[in-house]
Amino acid sequence: MPANEYHFITRWRVEGTCGEIADVLDDPVALERWWPSVYLRVEELAPANPRGVGRRARLLTKGWLPYTLRWELEIVEQRYPHGFSLVASGDFEGRGVWTFEQDGPFVDIVYDWRISAEKPLLRSLSFLLKPLFEANHRWAMAQGEESLRLELARRRATSEAARRSVPPPPGPITYAAAAVLGGVAAAGAALAYLIVRSMRRR
């Protein structure tokens, strides 16, 4: 696999129904509101057709590392309420598949995400910092799971007072904190790379 190609499988287990999960995750425009730690801005480019596919959105996203990603998604397959598939283009290109399976009062959620990083920073440094970029993705998805639980609680609230009692979703990490964390992690990754390279030369 080329250094700039990534394959992530994320698993969440959330109390609710497949319909509830699909109604939240199938709406890219709402991501900016309920998953603000990652989705900084979302602009709808085209609505879905009657079959629920063709919806397109332009996104600005970030993790805890001090860089942003500009990309577009299009929903290309709809299996409501059991999931959907999307294609991505821009700073990364590839395909994502969401799958929802009911298990009693819970929903097992799987996100299969295969992409190539096309942002110049990621393309040029993936050979060295791929573990760091992977950790950045895992952090983003962990934020998503927490934010999804909070969004479901808000939607289920039966009064405005109950809705206000639900904590807000975690917001984006500041660039100052991200720079410190990213610098420490990058230094550690670079040191590990140099050690491995030195050992291979012996």
Model regions: which residues?
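Hydrophobic ligand-binding cavity/cleft-lining segments
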Residues: 1-50, 191-202
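A short, polar/proline- and glycine-enriched secondary-structure boundary/capping micro-motif
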Residues: 68-70, 95-99, 119-125
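Terminal "cap-and-tail" regions of soluble proteins that handle hydrophobic small molecules
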Residues: 2-4, 14, 103-202
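Surface loops and adjacent helix of pleckstrin homology
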Residues: 36, 89, 112
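Glycine-rich portal/gate segments that line the openings of hydrophobic small-molecule binding cavities
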Residues: 43-95, 106-108, 143-147, 151-158, ...
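Hydrophobic pocket/interface hotspot
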Residues: 20-25, 31, 57-59, 75, ...
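Short, surface-exposed charged micro-motifs
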Residues: 11, 74, 97-99
